[in-house]
Structures are given as C-alpha cells and as structure tokens.
Design a protein with these regions (language model features):
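Long, positively charged, glycine-interspersed low-complexity recognition regions
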Residues: 183-245
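Conserved proline-anchored active-site loop of SAM-dependent methyltransferases
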Residues: 28, 46-60, 69-73, 116-118, ...
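Acceptor-substrate binding/catalytic loop of class I
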Residues: 16, 149-150, 180-184
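Short loop/helix-cap segments at secondary-structure boundaries that form the rim of catalytic
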Residues: 59-63, 143-144, 159-163, 209-218
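S-adenosyl-L-methionine
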Residues: 1-57, 62
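Short, polar loop motifs at secondary-structure junctions
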Residues: 51-55, 136-139, 206-211
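Class I S-adenosyl-L-methionine-dependent methyltransferase module
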Residues: 63-153, 157-159
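Mobile active-site "lid"/loop adjacent to the S-adenosyl-L-methionine
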Residues: 125-128, 173-186
Length: 245
C-alpha cells in the first residue's frame, strides 16, 4: 500500500455529500482493481463521470495510470481544481453561505458553501456553525489524494467516447432525492449508455438495483445518511454488464 493510501486510512472523512463513497470506497477500489488486472487492463486510464467529492477517486492516489474525473456539478469541479492548487478554505459563516446560495455565478467558493448544507443536500439550509472550519480542514486533507487527477470541464457524461478505460459510475440512485434546480436524472438513458460503454471498456456501476442484463460482482449493506431516510439500510451493489464479469 502506498504512502497516500496510508494517509487516507488515518483520515476519517465525515462530510456527508449526498451519494459519497467515503466509507466503502476502499472496498470498491479493491474489487475494480483486481478485476482490471485480471482483464488485462493494467495501468489503463481510470475514469469517474460522477466523481463528486472523490469518495472513490481518493483511493486511486497511488495508481500509475491516468486518473480522470467529471461531474455535472460545476461548483464541485471548480472546488476540486482549487484544492489541487493548494487552496486552503477558511470557516464558512452563515452570512457567507446565504450569499453563495443566492449567487448565480459558479465558483469554487460556491461549491465550498454548498458543503455546509444540512445533510450534504445542496443548499437546503446552513449547517456549519457547530464545528467552524471543520469542512475546510477535511478538504485540505483530501488535497494530496487528488494530485494529478485531471478534472474535465463540467458537462454531461453522455459525451464520453473512448476505449480500453476502467470506468466507475456512481450515478444518482433511481427514485431518490433530486437536488433543487437540477434536471431529474434519466436512469433509463444511463443504463443504455452503460451497455454501449461496456462494449469497449471495463465498466462498473454502483446502484441498489439494475436491469436484468447487469450482474452483481460485489455487495455491501450500508446506512443512509440523508435526513429523510437516515438510519435505514440500503444495499450497495457493484454491477457489470453481463459477459464482461
């Protein structure tokens, strides 16, 4: 295990950005890497089209191949790029939070402000006063784990066209909470794209359920952190398209 991976094992990252993989990212990484090696994908580019706050990506810090991340949340991508430039964010006050909430301009600061939202759900209400500066300190610890990651300009994952990539997708769960102001995620279209990508790439998908032509290669029960379902068990499955397992 490399130095950066050991660094993260010592780091309990507790920010609850919805859909994050902080708690089980290491297990997912291990399954994907093992299967990639078995399939002859040694050091092939690794791509996450739904990278979020790098809950899974951080575990690839020691990976020798290219690492590429993308997300539809423009503010989060700008935030990650700023962290790569050694940005050290300060404590976020409620006044600053409300200013960014009402702003229509995308920025790293707006992405940072959104992480102070209740239960990590986008600008649902300020929840950063009880531990001032905690979110910023946590992000600073993330910085060395994403050095060298190429974050693509925010945009739709549908435009991706490449071959021989290792791809990990952590899409919004079907039927779960949508962020205010965002277009509802098209799950049916997503699975069609996964079938297409799987023809020329090694593709893994995190979901609780999937179409019948996808099969489970790993599974784990976890507790939901979103307030409306907090404490309820959810089965996290890792799927591949049948014939590629």
């Amino acid at each position: 295990m490399g130095t950066l991976s050991r660094l993260f094992i010592k780091f309990h990252y507790i920010m609850s950005y919805q859909g994050g993989k902080q708690r089980i990212g290491k297990e997912i990484h291990d399954v994907i890497l093992r299967r990639a090696l078995e399939a002859g994908y040694d050091n092939r580019p690794y791509f996450e089209p739904f990278v979020g706050l790098c809950g899974a990506m951080r575990w690839w810090a020691d990976y020798p191949g290219k690492r590429i991340g993308n997300d539809s949340n423009q503010d989060i991508i700008l935030l990650l790029k700023s962290l790569q430039k050694e940005w050290n964010p300060t404590a976020m006050t409620e006044e600053e939070y409300m200013t960014q909430k009402s702003s229509s301009q995308h920025s790293a600061l707006r992405g940072y402000a959104s992480l102070h939202s209740f239960r990590g759900m986008l600008f649902t209400g300020y929840d950063g006063g009880h531990r001032p500066g905690h979110v910023g300190r946590s992000l600073v610890k993330l910085t060395p784990l994403i050095k060298g990651v190429r974050f693509l300009p925010p945009g739709s994952y549908e435009r991706f066209r490449s071959k021989k990539f290792i791809i990990y997708c952590d899409p919004p769960y079907k039927g779960t909470t949508s962020y205010r102001g965002q277009v509802k995620f098209d799950s049916e279209k997503f699975w069609e794209i996964m079938r297409l990508w799987s023809k020329d790439n090694l593709v893994f998908i995190s979901e609780s359920i999937a179409p019948d032509d996808f099969e489970i290669v790993w599974s784990r029960v976890k507790r939901c952190q979103v307030s409306t379902n907090k404490g309820k068990a959810r089965t996290e499955n890792l799927y591949v398209y049948r014939g590629t397992a």
